[in-house]
Amino acid sequence: MALCSLLVIAIITLPLGQMIVQPSIHDLVEVLQDKEVLRSILLSMECAAMAALIALVIGTPFAYLLARNEFPGKKVVESIVDIPIMIPHPIIGIAILGVASPDHVLGRILEKMGIEIMGSVTGIVLVLTFVGLPFYINTVKNGFEAIPERLENVARSLGASFGSTFLRITLPLGWRAMLAGIIMCMARALSEFGAVIIVAYHPMIAPVLIYERFTAYGLKYSQPVAVILILISLILFVLLRFIGKPGKKRL
């Protein structure tokens, strides 16, 4: 078991560790002074945050529905939610462009509304929401399932409405799961490349910039940008661990 554990850790840490230590401090400082890099990282963070906000608004009620209800076809619905995790991400980009094109009824509606998907921030946010939503829903659903339903039932038996019960019982007990879901959604969105490059090469987010610099200039110019993105993702996951740690003592 110890050997397997070491092997797993080595597989994960060796490539990433080598990438992190290879660029010099000078290279990293130079990258952080590069306006194009800063713009792409800022755009990535903004789009990931918007995707997480959308996931919070539309994903929370859906996660609660899945956590608290049994209905015919529930397993099918849960499988549909997981589809963005399973399919190759270039397919996601192609699928989104398909429904957003003028040949599709939805695309014509968007065109009349003046909403552009291809080559726009809106398109990037749509893609990031698509890939990040399953992580938010699954995380929050598990959090709601961990809350004893009897607490909600007692509140309702005492005359509390559904909304009041959710705000006073479910939300205070489930906020950690919701915050963890937001972080998971953002982390996943920050790493997305395959679907974004098809829908919106420009404006350029960080993963697309890394790809462009690698294809144009090689490892030397792409690695420092990649290291910055790795460190941002690492910070998010450290936050996630701190958020989840007290949860073991709850309920």
Regions found by a protein language model. Give the residues of each.
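Glycine/proline-centered hinge or cleavage motifs at structural transition points of membrane proteins
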Residues: L158-G159, P172
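Short coil/turn motifs that cap or connect alpha-helices
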Residues: P72, A160-F162
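Extracytoplasmic catalytic/substrate-binding loops of multi-pass membrane glycan-assembly enzymes
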Residues: M204-I205
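The alpha-helix within a helix-turn-helix
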Residues: A155
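Membrane-water interface segments at the C-terminal ends of transmembrane alpha-helices
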Residues: M1-H26, K35-E145, I169, L173-A189, ...
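Membrane-helix/interface signature in polytopic inner-membrane proteins
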Residues: K141-E152, F162
